[in-house]
Every structure is written in structure tokens, then in C-alpha cells.
Regions:
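P-loop/Walker A NTP-binding module and the surrounding RecA-like catalytic core of P-loop NTPases
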Residues: 1-174
Length: 174
């Protein structure tokens, strides 16, 4: 597995991803802070192919869906990945904070329009947030929830279990 540090703007983003690479045994590809995220993605595809990695995860900077230049940058990263690998990505996931609320729908819709999402990763389900907005996202945008984050450890990123999610969202009366 390889990780691409395409979040070249947030302070300590590369270091944070380096920690995850170390924890998981993944190979990390990155460049200097402020580098072009598309260039990092291109280098990462080449490095992953050279190493025989079967999975490449490209971490991009968080961004507001209302900032058009940042959304265009994200679309560019996707185009670079497709061109460098010769095919579309297997997955394009939006990582959505479970505390986001109704704004999450607009965010998902605009990200989906810009880069063609394949699903969602819902994080921070270990707190009090329920993540109910994903029901609307799933219903109206036809985007499945693929992963959920329930903590800070490697094993806390889990496959989505609809029954477990529904039980947490609407618990049985006691």
C-alpha cells in the first residue's frame, strides 16, 4: 500500500500522514509544503506502480465546497491520477465529519458534481454525532457509505455496517 501526501498546504499534514504510513507499513510519497497536489499525485502513481503497490490512497487537503478554485484543483488531481494510471480511480471517497449536519448534503452534492464520488467515509462516530445527514446523501445522490471512523487507531476505520448504523441512529426503546 502507498499513501500520497497531496495535502501540501495544511501545516503538519505530511507529518500526520507519515505517522499513519508508519503505523500501517505503507510507503509514503510526498513533496515540499506548498507543492502542486497534482504533481504529488502523479509521482505517487509512478512510485506505487514501481513498488508494486496494490492500493494507493491519495490524501488531499480539506476544502470548502464553495471555493471554486479549490474544487477545480481537486478535479485536476483526479485527471492527473487517471492520466498517470491509465484508468479512473477505483474509489473516490468524500470524508465527511459526522458532526457536519445539513451542510453535508450541499458539500457532498458539489464534490460529487466536481469529481464523481463513489462513496462516503463518515468519521467521528465515536462521539455524540449520529451522522444522519448520510441518509439524505444516500437517498438523493445514490452514494453509499463505504467506511466509518470510530476513533484514532488503525482498526477504528471500519467497513460500513447498515444494521449497526441504524441501531445507533434510532436505538431500541428500553
Amino acid at each position: 500500500m502507498s499513501l500520497a501526501a497531496s495535502d501540501t498546504f495544511r501545516a503538519a499534514a505530511g507529518e500526520q500522514l507519515e505517522t499513519w504510513a508508519s503505523r500501517t507499513g505503507a510507503h509514503l510519497v510526498g513533496q515540499a509544503r506548498g507543492a502542486d497536489p497534482g504533481a504529488v499525485a502523479f509521482d505517487a502513481v509512478q512510485a506505487a506502480q514501481a513498488r508494486g503497490s496494490d492500493v494507493l490512497i491519495v490524501d488531499t487537503a480539506g476544502r470548502l465546497h464553495t471555493r471554486e478554485p479549490l474544487m477545480q484543483e481537486l478535479a485536476k488531481v483526479r485527471r492527473v491520477l487517471e492520466k498517470a494510471s491509465g484508468r479512473p480511480p477505483d474509489e473516490v471517497l468524500l470524508v465527511l465529519d459526522a458532526t457536519t449536519g445539513q451542510n453535508g448534503f450541499a458539500q457532498a452534492r458539489l464534490f460529487h458534481e466536481a469529481i464523481g464520488l463513489s462513496g462516503l467515509c463518515l468519521t467521528k462516530l465515536d462521539g455524540t454525532a449520529k451522522g444522519g445527514i448520510v441518509l439524505r446523501i444516500h437517498r438523493e445522490l445514490k452514494l453509499p457509505i463505504k467506511l466509518v471512523g470510530v476513533g484514532e487507531r488503525v482498526d477504528d476505520l471500519q467497513g460500513f455496517d447498515a444494521e449497526k448504523f441504524a441501531a445507533a441512529l434510532v436505538p431500541e426503546p428500553e
